[in-house]
Amino acid sequence: MAMTVAPTRKSSSLNSVFQRVGVYGFGSGSSQKRCKYDIQEEEGTMEMVQIGAERTKNVLILMSDTGGGHRASAEAIRDAFRLEFGDEYQVFVKDVWKEYAGWPLNDMERSYKFMVKHVQLWKVAFHSTSPKWIHSCYLAAIAAFYAKFHPGVNRCYCPSEEVAKRALLDGLEESQTRVFGLPIRPSFCRAVLVKDDLRVELEMDCQLPAVLLMGGGEGMGPVKKTAKALGETLFDERLQKPIGQLIIICGRNKDLASTLESLEWKIPVKVKGFQTQMEKWMGACDCIITKAGPGTIAEALIRGLPIILNDYIPGQEKGNVPYVVDNGAGVFTRSPKETAKLVAEWFSTKTDELKRMSENALKLAQPNAVFDIVKDIHELACQRGPLANIPYVFTSSFSSLI
């Protein structure tokens, strides 16, 4: 069995990728024992010939660590493979730009994090590299990659019907697409969580409704102003008691966490840094305030949390706002005072609206998406066999990125 991978002029780069990933027996160690290949170069092509069919199947996930959502989805797929298939699959998650590209692409993570913290700068960069302004092929290929679908893929997993329709318009066949939802950490999908128990575990007030305020992994957005507005609005001055409690997730923003911890609060407040068990914090709360990151939205929907979107990154996150609002699962406002007013109403005079939005959120939720994806990949692998029938148009395009 052989697979034509790339023209000879690319073979050194491709060898480097496979060697550093450690999957295909180019290096030493246990992976070489599981599966070895002879490398044969002939008439401008490089072929990998498998020796021995019995081996652990390998999955290579290529991603870019520009924003927490990409890595989170990749790691969710990796974890789902482990839960579903154990040692049958070995999964490698690689940042293709950082690990295998040259400058400036290998510096994208640092540049991206700087620009999204300065939203207007990111907005200018995003739209100035749009194909409608730039005709250079290579710039368009990078800048507009988020909106393109490769017609040579075996399968394209779409988070929604709207995305699937766009894929069909861009040349994919219906048989190539599957609408399973966004892959979310298995802990969100299969955990059986009881709100009262979680509040005891997390040392929260068991009687007061709770709002979760998030700023993403980097602690972005108007977190401080919103927190202070909530601290005032969720305190009933007439009765001199709180009507709600506040959980603030500051991510990796240690300065923000330190500032918020130093403030005096009239209501119960917990300030937390980067968290790895968000399913518990979401499960213990009644609504969430966050920017329009797709991963956080998908997680909130699974937990049935009404969502207040208070910001979005121009370009890739803008379309997430109408998805939440138009489906009745939340609202959008950039005003900290308006945000605090909405939460106070949900916790007092508009509890029916809060309940209705929670029900709508659960209707949109797709908790089994990550398991549906890995099961479908497994079925494809079983049908096609290892390294069989992979279209050259796909492999050649991958090689061009290296």
Give the label of every model feature segment.
Residues 191-285, 318:
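Donor-nucleotide binding loops and adjacent catalytic segments primarily
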Residues 76-138:
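Conserved N-terminal ligand/cofactor-binding loop architecture of enzyme catalytic domains
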Residues 288-290, 306-315:
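Short hydrophobic beta-strand element within catalytic cores of glycosyltransferases
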Residues 283-293:
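Acidic donor-binding loop of glycosyltransferase active sites
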Residues 2-98:
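N-terminal subdomain of nucleotide-sugar transferases
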Residues 141-193:
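Active-site-proximal region of nucleotide-activated glycan assembly enzymes
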Residues 5, 12, 16, 347-402:
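C-terminal amphipathic helix plus adjacent low-complexity
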